[in-house]
C-alpha cells in the first residue's frame, strides 16, 4: 500500500510538471508564430507574390524581409526573362496608349499585350506608366537647354535601353511583368515633343481607362502642337484638335488654303472639323487665331505605322 501511494504521488507530480512545461512551450511559441505571420503578410502585400513564394523567401533569408523581397524580385525576373523568350512569337495587338503632358513637353507611348483582360490589369497599366515616365525623363535629359521645337520618335529597341532608376532597366521591368501576367507584352513605340515659349500642346485620349489621375490611357491618342489661340480657351482648343485627329485620322498637315477633297481627305487642315462639320479645320483655326504646326496620332495595334506623318 505504501509503495502504491508513493508511485501515485510521483506520477501525479510528473504529470503536473509536463503540463506546466507544455503550457510554457505553447506560451513562448505564440509570439514567434504571430511575428512570422506578420512578416509573411507584409511581404505578400509589398510584393504581390503568392503566399507560398513569400514563405519560401523568408525561410531562405532567415526572416530578413529586405533580403526576401530582393530574392523574390530576382527569381521573378529570371522566370520573366525565360517566359518572355517562350512567348515572344505570340500575337500582341491589344494594349494601351499612355499619354502625359507636362510643362512644355509631352510623351505618348504604346504598350501591347495579347488580351484586353491583361490591358485592364493594374500591373500592366503600371508598366505603361513606367514606360511613359522613363521616356519623358530621357527626353528631359537629352534636351536640356533646348530652345526650339523638339520631336523624337523611339522604337522598341530604343525604349528597351531606357532605365527606370539607378538599378532597374525598362527591359527588366518588362520581363518581370511578363512573368507575372503570363502573356506576351511588347513596348512598341513612343514619341516625345518639346515646345518653346508661345507654343502649346493639345492632347486627347479615346477609350480612356477610369481611375487614372497622373496620366491618361486609352485605345487611341493624339498630340497636337499649335500656336496662338484665345486666352482662357487654350485647353479646350487643344482638346478639340486632338479629338479631331483621333477621329478623322489625318496623315499629313496640308496648307491653310487647301481646298477640301470630301470624305477621302487625308490632310488635316482641309478636313471637315469633327466637332463642327460645317467648317474646315483651317476655318476653325482662323476664327480662333491659331495655327497647327504638327501632330501625332497613335492607334493601339495599328499595322506598320509609327504615328508620324
From Swiss-Prot:
Task: Name the Gene Ontology biological process terms.
Answer: mitochondrial translational elongation
Q: Which residues form a coiled coil?
A: none
Annotated compartments: Mitochondrion
PANTHER family recorded: ELONGATION FACTOR TS (PTHR11741), ELONGATION FACTOR TS, MITOCHONDRIAL (PTHR11741:SF0)
Protein function = Associates with the EF-Tu.GDP complex and induces the exchange of GDP to GTP. It remains bound to the aminoacyl-tRNA.EF-Tu.GTP complex up to the GTP hydrolysis stage on the ribosome.
Q: Please, what other remarks does the record include?
A: This protein may be expected to contain an N-terminal transit peptide but none has been predicted.
UniProt name for this protein: Elongation factor Ts, mitochondrial
Source organism per entry reads Salmo salar
Amino acid at each position: 500500500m505504501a509503495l502504491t501511494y508513493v508511485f501515485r504521488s510521483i506520477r501525479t507530480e510528473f504529470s503536473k510538471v509536463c503540463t506546466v512545461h507544455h503550457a510554457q512551450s505553447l506560451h513562448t511559441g505564440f509570439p514567434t508564430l504571430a511575428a512570422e505571420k506578420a512578416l509573411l503578410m507584409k511581404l505578400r502585400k509589398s510584393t504581390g507574390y503568392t503566399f507560398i513564394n513569400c514563405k519560401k523567401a523568408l525561410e531562405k533569408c532567415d526572416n530578413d524581409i529586405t533580403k526576401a523581397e530582393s530574392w523574390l524580385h530576382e527569381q521573378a525576373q529570371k522566370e520573366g526573362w525565360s517566359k518572355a523568350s517562350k512567348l515572344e512569337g505570340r500575337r500582341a495587338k491589344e494594349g494601351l496608349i499612355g499619354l502625359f503632358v507636362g510643362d512644355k513637353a509631352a510623351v505618348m507611348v504604346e504598350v501591347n499585350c495579347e488580351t484586353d483582360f491583361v490591358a485592364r490589369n493594374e500591373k500592366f497599366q503600371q508598366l505603361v506608366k513606367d514606360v511613359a515616365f522613363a521616356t519623358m525623363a530621357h527626353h528631359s535629359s537629352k534636351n536640356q537647354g533646348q530652345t526650339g521645337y523638339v520631336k523624337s520618335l523611339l522604337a522598341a529597341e530604343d525604349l528597351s535601353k531606357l532605365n527606370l532608376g539607378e538599378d532597374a532597366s525598362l527591359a527588366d521591368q518588362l520581363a518581370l511583368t511578363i512573368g507575372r501576367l503570363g502573356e506576351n507584352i511588347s513596348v512598341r513605340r513612343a514619341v516625345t515633343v518639346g515646345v518653346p515659349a508661345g507654343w502649346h500642346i493639345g492632347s486627347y485620349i479615346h477609350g480612356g481607362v477610369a481611375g487614372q489621375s497622373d496620366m491618361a490611357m486609352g485605345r487611341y491618342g493624339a498630340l497636337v502642337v499649335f500656336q496662338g489661340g484665345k486666352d482662357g480657351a487654350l485647353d479646350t482648343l487643344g482638346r478639340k484638335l486632338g479629338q479631331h485627329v483621333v477621329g478623322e485620322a489625318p496623315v499629313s498637315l496640308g496648307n491653310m488654303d487647301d481646298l477640301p477633297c470630301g470624305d477621302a481627305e487625308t490632310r488635316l487642315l482641309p478636313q471637315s472639323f469633327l466637332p463642327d462639320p460645317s467648317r474646315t479645320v483651317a476655318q476653325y483655326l482662323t476664327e480662333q487665331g491659331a495655327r497647327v504646326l504638327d501632330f501625332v496620332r497613335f492607334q493601339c495595334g495599328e499595322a506598320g505605322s509609327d504615328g508620324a506623318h
